C-alpha cells in the first residue's frame, strides 16, 4: 500500500493552532500580506441553460471608446463603479475617499512619462506589495509590458476617460476595460502612485487588476508569482533559498537573460501576515489613520535625503510601531523585485551582486553595497556608472549575493517558457491545458491520505510518446513540467474563499490498460505507489514541478489536501517532446439493452419499442382481467407465486379498486406497506414525487397509472437496486456516502462520465453528502427512464438524437 503523504511545514499564514492527529500537515505558503476565509462555491453543470438571459454581449474597448467620443462624454464603468463597492467588501471605512479623474487631480496628466519603468511604482495604503513587485519586474521586459499595457492611450489625444489593460487569465488573454476615476484623499492618490505626480499608468493598471478580482481589497496579500503569471501566461518555479541548489546564482542569471520575472521575500517569524492589523485593532481605523497622516510633500519630484531620518516616512502601509523592518533595512513578510544580477571587481576580486527593489519606493538595505555604503569609493567610476549606482531613496539597491541568500528565504521565478534554467539550451515546448473542478461529495476526494475518496478526484491521462533529444544523456527519458493552478479563489474572497492547499500525484498506467480511458478505481490506488508527485501540498494558487520519466502512459491526479473542498482548477503540462494529455472520461452507456417503453406523443400513441425491434403499431396494455389470469413470469421467478408476490397481489387489489390500476398516491401506499416489512432496510419510505417518477418510467400508454404487471416489473427493479444500496450502506444507517454513488451506479449497469456523477451528487445528496434510499431509487428510476427514452429516439443507433420542442418537453416534463 502506498505510504502516507508527508510534507514539510512552512511558516503559516496566520497564528492558528495546529490540528491534532496523525496525518502530516501540508506546507503552508506565506502569503505576503493578507489572509482570508474558507467556503465552498456553488457548482452546476447545467448552469449554461441560464446564459441566454444573463445579458447582452460585452462591448469591446474600441466600441466603448468610440461611443464616448461620439457622445462627448467621459466613460463611467458600470461593472466597477467609482464607489465603496469597488473598494472594500469586509467593512465600511470611517473615512470617505473622493473619486477623481487625473485631470481633476493635477495639471497636465500623462499616462506614461519617458517610458514605463520600475521607479514609477510606489506602493500606497493597500497591502499589494506582491502585485507591485511583479509590475517592477514587468517593466524590465518591454515586449511583455506593451502586451499588458497598450501604449496607444492618452489623456490628450481622443481622451474619453476610458482605458484598458490585458491579463492572462487561466489559459487565455482577457481585455479589462476601466474608467479613470481613482480614489483620493486630500487630492492625493490613496493606493499605487508614481514618483511623478502627473503620471498615472501604474495607478490605472492597479485599478484594472482590482476589477479583475472584484475589488481593491481582494488584492490585499498574495504571492508575487500570481501577478507574474497574470502578466505573462508563464509558469512559475518556487525555491526555498536555504534548500536551493548550489548553482542558484547561475539559475538567477539565466532567468534574467531569458526575460523571466523574479521576486523574493523574507518569512515573517512573528506569525503575523504583513499588511494585516494587529489583534484588537480595527483595520478600518488603522488605514484611516494612515491616510490622514499622508505627507503631501512626498509627491514632489525633488530628491529626498535617505539618511535624513531613521524613522520611516509617513506614507506607509502600517504604523511604525507595527512594522517588521529589520535593523539591516529589509522588511519581513514583504515582496521585493529582483531587477538585476551582476559582478563587480572590488579590491582585486570579483563580487556577485543582486539588485532588488522595494515597491514602497523607499526603505532600503543599509548593509554592504547599499546606496550609501562607504566602500563604493573603491569601485571604478565606470563600473559604478554601469551599475547605475545612485544615492537616492527610490527603493532600489544592490547587495552581495552572499547577503541575499543569507537574509532572504524565498525566490519566485516566472519563466516565459518551460526551459530549465540549469540548461544552456532553449527548447520548443509543447503544452496541453485541461480545465477541471473538484465537486464536494463527488470528485473532491482529497490527497492519498484519504484512500476511500482519493480515487474519485479528476484524473488526467498523460501519454509521453518520445524521449528527449539529449546526446549526453544515455537514459530513455521524457522531460516534462506539471503546473496545477486553482481558479478564482482571490475573486471569491468576499464570499469567504481562501486558497486551498493543493498538489498532485502521478501514477504509471499498466500496459494492459494503455488506451483505456476508464476512471481508475479505488483498488488501483490502494496497491500501486505513485511514480512521482508534487514536492509538497501547499496553499498557493499554483503548484508546479519538473519530472523526468520513461516514455509510457501515466495518470495525473490533482487534488486538495483535505477532501470535500470544492473549487475549479487548470492543469498545464509542458513537455520537450510531443505528449497527449486529456481528462479521463468514461463512455456513457448502459450494460444490457432494456425494453424501451416510451412514445413521442403519449396522449395519442400506444407504442412499445425494443432496442433491436421495429415499433409495433397498436401494441398496448392487455386488459386487467387477462393480466390477472396470465401474468408474465419475471426473470428468476417460478411458476408458482411466491409469498411476496401473493402479498403484493392482495395489497394491490385492496388499493387499486375495480380498475386494477394505481395512481402515484396509491403506489406510495403499496410500496411503503411492503418496504416497511423489510426490517433490515432503514428507510422513511418513498415520497409522492418518487412514485410519480416510477409511474412515468413504467407507464406505457400515458394513463398516469400502473397495472399489476407493470407494478411487478417495477418491484423487481427496486429489489435489484435495493441489494446494491444495502451493499454500500455498510453502517446500516439507511444512507450511502455520495462518493460511493459512482460505484453503485456502475453496479446497476449505468456508466456515466464525471459531469453526470457531479450532477447526481448535487441533485440527490443531502447537506452531509449522504443519499437515502428514496433518493437512491429515484435516481435510478430517472437514469433508466432517460436511457430508455434516448434509445427510443435513436432509431439509427448512432448515439445522436434530434427532437422538436414538443418531443423535448414531453421527454422532460413526464419523467
From Swiss-Prot:
PROSITE patterns, sorted: CALPAIN_CAT (PS50203), EF_HAND_1 (PS00018), EF_HAND_2 (PS50222), THIOL_PROTEASE_CYS (PS00139)
Catalytic reactions of this protein: Broad endopeptidase activity
Alphabetized SMART domains for the sequence: calpain_III, CysPc, EFh
UniProt binding sites for Ca(2+) 2: 699, 701, 703, 705, 710
One biological process term in Gene Ontology: muscle structure development
Biased composition (Basic and acidic residues): 616-628
Residue positions of the active site: 129, 334, 358
Gene Ontology MF annotations: calcium ion binding; calcium-dependent cysteine-type endopeptidase activity; catalytic activity; ligase regulator activity; molecular adaptor activity; peptidase activity; sodium ion binding; structural constituent of muscle
GO cellular component: cytoplasm; cytosol; myofibril; nucleolus; nucleus; plasma membrane; protein-containing complex; T-tubule
Predominant cellular place of this UniProt entry's protein: cytoplasm
Alphabetized UniProt keyword annotations: Calcium, Cytoplasm, Hydrolase, Metal-binding, Nucleus, Protease, Repeat, Thiol protease
Binding site for Ca(2+) 1: 656, 659, 661, 666
Region (Disordered) residue spans: 7-36, 605-646
EC number(s) on file: 3.4.22.54
Residue numbers binding Ca(2+) 3: 729, 731, 733, 735, 740
Ranges of residues in domain EF-hand: 643-677, 686-719, 716-751, 781-815
Enzyme superclass (EC): hydrolase
Residue span, Calpain catalytic domain: 74-417
Quaternary structure note: Homodimer; via EF-hand domain 4. Interacts with TTN/titin. Interacts with CMYA5; this interaction, which results in CMYA5 proteolysis, may protect CAPN3 from autolysis. Interacts with SIMC1. Interacts with UTP25; the interaction is required for CAPN3 translocation to the nucleolus.
Similarity field: Belongs to the peptidase C2 family.
Name recorded for this polypeptide: Calpain-3
Gene symbol of the encoding locus: CAPN3
